[in-house]
Amino acid sequence: MPEQSNDYRVVVFGAGGVGKSSLVLRFVKGTFRDTYIPTIEDTYRQVISCDKSVCTLQITDTTGSHQFPAMQRLSISKGHAFILVFSVTSKQSLDELSPIYKLIVQIKGSVEDIPIMLVGNKCDETQREVHTREAQAVAQEWKCAFMETSAKMNYNVKELFQELLTLETRRSVSLSVDGKRSSKQKRADRIKGKCALM
């Protein structure tokens, strides 16, 4: 199938086992699996509103290993927005995002207009190695947004993708294609002037 030029491409990066696939599957299909199945690369699609017409939100769930640097570079070069996922139970998983962030900057040049979300997943777990303040400091250093999520508990999953689209300033994108929005979403839409989520 030829790639559509009006696809809005979101790329999800992070170490193996941090819950990248779980976040994507929870968002796209509303499901959660307890077993860990390593991903090489999967792509999921969902219809969204983009510049007042219908287009496809294409979410690329990347491998957690560093065995495929060419695939990483290709995903970054084609990506419009990025989700950098770590597990709050693993400081190493946060540290492993630094070279990926630097690669995004290297390939994209300025990331000033590129939506990037730093995501602390598994916030339902009690054995934390990364505290909220520490992750917020990294996000501030990288000049990106930060959010904690739990794919297992379905906490902040929809909000993560809404916020990512809200950060988009180059064009108007929305997960809503039928025009129905809550009053809270309408207010946020007026404030940002860009996105709303259904």
Curated annotation (Swiss-Prot):
It comes from the Eukaryota. Keywords: Cell membrane, GTP-binding, Lipoprotein, Membrane, Methylation, Nucleotide-binding, Prenylation. The modification Cysteine methyl ester is found at C195. Gene3D superfamilies: P-loop containing nucleotide triphosphate hydrolases (3.40.50.300). It is a lipid-anchor. Its main location: membrane. A motif (Effector region) lies at residues 36-44. It is found in: Cell membrane. GTP binds at residues 17-22, 33-39, 61-65, 121-125, 151-152. It holds the Pfam family Ras. Residues 196-198 form a propeptide. SMART domains: RAB, RAS, RHO. GO terms for molecular function: GTP binding; GTPase activity. One of its GO terms (cellular component) is plasma membrane. Belongs to the small GTPase superfamily. Di-Ras family. Displays low GTPase activity and exists predominantly in the GTP-bound form. This is GTP-binding protein Di-Ras1. It comes from Mus musculus (Mouse). The gene is Diras1.
